Amino acid sequence: MKGYSSGQLSMPSYGAGTANSEFELITGMNLDHFGAAEYPYKTVLQDTTTESMATVLKNYGYKAHAIHDNSAAFYDRDLVFSQLGFDTFTTKESMNIKKWTENGWAKDQILTGCIMDSLDSTKGQDYVYCISVQGHGDYPTTQIIENPEITVEGIEDEALKNKYTYYVNQVYQMDQFVGKLVKALQQRGEPTILCMYGDHLPSLEIEDEDLTYGNKYQTSYFMWDNIGLKKKDGTIEAYDLGSEVLNKCNIH
């Protein structure tokens, strides 16, 4: 991925709060303009629509799809995604999930087929917002993975070491999912921009001084494409990422 745009995203939360990171990404709104500890999915979006990536792209003929390998009701997404302009919402209730983490979350490998199905469901262009769940907490304090592919060293606290061992092995498998998704998109051949990001760092007692770069309110993102876009790296706010994608599509 070194040849593609990447960088750090400044997120509104640490350790939890996926829905708020998601809200900023989809709407381009800064949560600082909302109430303290407010979740717009639980408040204003219950009975109000708003402009979003989905509504903007639909004005250009796109269909908008949301996908999540967890319950539709999680964070009330089943209620608010229509308010955000999505045409379809595919969740675990309609997925044939056969592989689960040791902690009971769906493994993200199921998502490649779901994304391809959404892209194939129309003859035109599509906007797909996909939320993965494999790396979700809580993280087990006991060793529940037999023969982990990735081992952890340098942590004396056994419970914390077990948490990290579980987490990094999920991330390893999620990375494999990303590779397979990129390969599937390459084979499909349709002009595509794939933007991947982390919604927040995990709740693993992380402090700024533990990090090689950035701070605990920053996550990584990258944008893969098959249309020859110019590489542009940098640190941006989460609510600006959608605009970056639209700019690459020459939509202003």
Annotate each language-model stretch with its function.
Residues M1-H252:
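Solvent-exposed soluble domains appended to multi-pass membrane proteins
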